[in-house]
Design a protein with these regions (language model features):
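Metal-dependent catalytic core segments for phosphate chemistry
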Residues: 34-44, 78-95, 100
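Extended, hydrophobic alpha-helical segments in both membrane/secreted and soluble proteins
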Residues: 32-33, 55-62, 73-84, 111-118, ...
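C-terminal cap/substrate-recognition subdomain and adjoining C-terminal extension
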Residues: 89-221
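Basic, amphipathic N-terminal segments
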Residues: 19, 43-47, 68-69
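Asp-based phosphoryl-transfer active-site loop
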Residues: 22-36
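Substrate-recognition element of Asp-dependent hydrolases with the DxDx(T/V) motif
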Residues: 54, 58-92, 104-105, 142, ...
Length: 221
């Protein structure tokens, strides 16, 4: 028991001394689910409670827990956005919905470019990002073009996905203390990104305030 307590204290000190990563960037096809979006309708992709789809659902369970511990989730997927969103919004076994992601880039642009844009949107450095993708070519491109981004290896078998993600959490994201603010980070960053987007579109300060639906009350001098 004493040895276990001492080991726990050492681990806690290690967590306190390091700077945890903040954003987990996820691919979709053959990563968050098995198969390819858009090939048929939204049900045949591998994501279920049976053997063929359970590995991907277990992965989503781990990622959902990470999000609840304050990890920001983002999507970088080469896909038709409509097909991908159909699965995210309507697949009966999806545990992660659009509202769980602080930023999304579902298009055909290079993934390093999309990661840069999401970093700007979230106002975070790319050195706080971890990129998880089944494609070796995509992983290598991010390593070459964004060497500050952490790019773990992808497991060889689907059943290794959930244990691999749990290890990624412990190695890069785990914190000594999780606060209420940490647990609400996704909503906070989504709101900030929305305000920033409105600010860019506004032609004047008054227009920006109007878009935010804020009432300004004059104060007498």
């Amino acid at each position: 028991l004493l040895a276990s307590s001492a080991a726990s204290d050492v681990y806690k000190r290690q967590l306190e001394e390091r700077t945890p990563k903040k954003v987990l960037v996820l691919d979709l096809d053959n990563t968050l689910w098995g198969g390819l979006a858009g090939e048929t309708d939204h049900t045949p992709v591998l994501l279920s409670e049976d053997h063929s789809g359970l590995a991907y659902k277990n992965l989503q369970r781990v990622i959902k827990l990470m999000q609840e511990q304050g990890v920001l989730l983002a999507i970088a997927s080469k896909n038709n956005e409509e097909d991908a969103m159909e699965i995210l919004e309507h697949h009966p076994h999806m545990l992660l919905g659009p509202e769980d992601f602080a930023a999304r880039r579902i298009n055909w642009d290079p993934k390093p470019d999309n990661i840069r844009k999401m970093a700007e949107e979230l106002n975070l450095g790319t050195d706080s990002f971890v990129f998880f993708d089944d494609s070796e070519a995509e992983r290598e491109m991010v390593r070459q073009m964004l060497p500050e981004v952490t790019v773990p290896d992808f497991p060889a078998r689907p059943e290794e996905l959930a244990p691999c993600m749990a290890k990624i959490y412990e190695e890069y994201f785990a914190r000594a203390v999780i606060t209420k603010e940490d647990r609400e980070k996704t909503a906070q960053y989504r709101a900030n990104a929305g305000r920033n987007a409105m600010a860019e579109q506004a032609v004047s300060f008054e227009d920006y305030v109007k878009k935010l639906e804020i009432c300004l009350i004059p104060v007498d001098p």
